[in-house]
Amino acid sequence: MNSANPSYIYLVDDDASFRSSLNGAFISLGYQVKTFSSADEFLAHPDIAWPAMLISDMRMPGKSGVELQKKLIDETLGIPIVFISGESTLEEAVQGLKQGAIDFIQKPFNMEDLLQTIEASIEKQRQNLAKKYKSIVKEERLARLAPRERDVCMLMVKGFSNPKMADDLQLSIETIKQYKQNVFGKLGIEDLAGLIAFMHD
């Protein structure tokens, strides 16, 4: 686990010894862990750091695991959930999975299986976060362009020649050339191949 890019596990279970055992195991593997004795205690937590995984018991005093899941859905907090339980019914397990749980694991369980599930989910989150960040950076760079410069940029990517762009945009060829220079300069891109790669990324 890369400590420079930590992953977070939120553990909700009313069994103190079970929480302590899993907490120690996860910390030893480099995860940042926060534990909670009930669904309500978790819901009172101010925020969630990402990438993250919620591991929850199904049956607890107060809100059940499924009720906690429903509350998170209602609040559009899409944290991936793995349910771990030794007493749940098949109906509860099916309901949790239908509501989007990553997995349902019965006690006793194989720790390696749980870790594989967690890491697969967190890796997927990392990839999604990287794509989202790249998209934000791209939009910030494109926002540097004036409207006409963006028009020229789009036509460049489509392979339009200078005369064709000038005709379509009702501009002079010299103006088109200037806009093209502006596009490369403002986006920090050296050539057309780089621009095409940037726009299609």
Q: PLM features: residue spans?
A:
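Acidic, metal-coordinating helix/loop segments flanking the phosphotransfer/catalytic sites
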Residues: 35-53
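Active-site residues of response regulator receiver
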Residues: 57, 85
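Acidic catalytic/metal-coordinating carboxylates
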Residues: 37-38, 64-68
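C-terminal output helix
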Residues: 89, 105, 109-118
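Basic, Lys/Arg-enriched C-terminal extension of HTH/homeodomain DNA-binding domains
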Residues: 184-201
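Conserved acidic segment of CheY-like receiver
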Residues: 3-18, 22-26, 39, 54-55, ...
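Receiver (REC) domain active-site loop signature in two-component systems and cognate sites
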Residues: 60
